[in-house]
């Protein structure tokens, strides 16, 4: 693709798309593959002109020993060969219990300076990757019923991760997959949980946005209000505002919004179909 784009003035002659600048390696989990295979894929992407690689993995939570000296050596070799290619490690902690230590009383253990103590293996893994200044580490997590739908837990997690050099990237509303109504949390409740969890956090600790994935692209749940809008039908209980964050196929749509009347039981877009007030984003076309 990138070769064709370069040979045709910066756009693909059939699709009109520009070069592929950034690639997400996801799955499955790429780190279920051996280092050799991961390195080969990354090198191939770099050779194809990709400027930035993101790699999504749950291994930091499930198997932190995966980030051993052999893995780090592979990453160092890649960076030495392709120093201009950016790399982001997208990890997936859903709850602070996945990486913090607790005492017999169930409370998180503290270091002498008041910071929270990490599981040793996870601490070593995080320090191994963050010590390499060219690896950016970011966390993203879905909000899951009965698992992390708790503002206090989310606050602890965001603060502890940022202190360890991990950026808080996204929290997600659940998707409309098989049995999703059994573990998804209502959208408006998730927004309130995240908003409550970020009270008391610093600006940099509270960077995470709440995202829900529409077919048009990542969409932010930008606001939920409690008061009616005078003279506007359907706003008697307040409104929810969706905002398009990213639409790779139609970048001009970024920032466009959709306003719907509130539905406290809604867990997916179709639960708002009967209460759309304004939709410049085209979420309900």
Model-derived features with residue positions:
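Conserved AdoMet/S-adenosylmethionine-binding subsite of the radical SAM
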Residues: 2-5, 9, 13-22, 28-189, ...
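Auxiliary Fe-S-binding modules of radical SAM enzymes
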Residues: 155-285
């Amino acid at each position: 693709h990138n070769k064709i784009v370069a040979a045709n003035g910066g756009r693909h002659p059939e699709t009109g798309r520009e070069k592929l600048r950034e690639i997400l390696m996801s799955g499955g989990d790429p780190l279920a593959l051996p280092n050799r295979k991961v390195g080969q894929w990354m090198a191939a992407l770099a050779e194809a002109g990709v400027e930035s690689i993101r790699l999504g993995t749950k291994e930091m939570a499930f198997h932190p020993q995966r980030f051993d000296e052999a893995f780090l050596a592979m990453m160092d070799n890649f960076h030495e060969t392709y120093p201009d290619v950016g790399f982001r490690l997208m990890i997936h902690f859903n709850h602070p219990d996945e990486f913090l230590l607790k005492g017999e009383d169930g409370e998180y253990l503290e270091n002498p300076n008041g910071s929270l103590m990490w599981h040793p293996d996870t601490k070593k893994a995080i320090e191994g990757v963050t010590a390499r200044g060219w690896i950016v580490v970011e966390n993203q997590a879905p909000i899951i019923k009965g698992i992390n739908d708790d503002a206090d837990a989310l606050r602890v997690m965001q603060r502890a991760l940022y202190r360890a050099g991990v950026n808080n990237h996204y929290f997600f509303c659940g998707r409309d997959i098989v049995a999703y109504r059994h573990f998804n949390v209502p959208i408006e409740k998730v927004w309130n949980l995240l908003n409550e969890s970020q009270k008391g956090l610093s600006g940099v600790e509270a960077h995470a946005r709440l995202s829900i994935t529409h077919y048009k692209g990542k969409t932010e749940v930008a606001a939920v209000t409690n008061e009616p809008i005078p003279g506007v039908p359907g706003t008697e209980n307040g409104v929810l505002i969706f905002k398009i964050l990213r639409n790779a196929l139609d970048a001009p749509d970024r920032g466009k919004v959709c306003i719907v009347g509130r539905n406290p039981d809604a867990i997916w877009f179709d639960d708002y179909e009967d209460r759309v007030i304004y939709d410049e984003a085209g979420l309900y076309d």
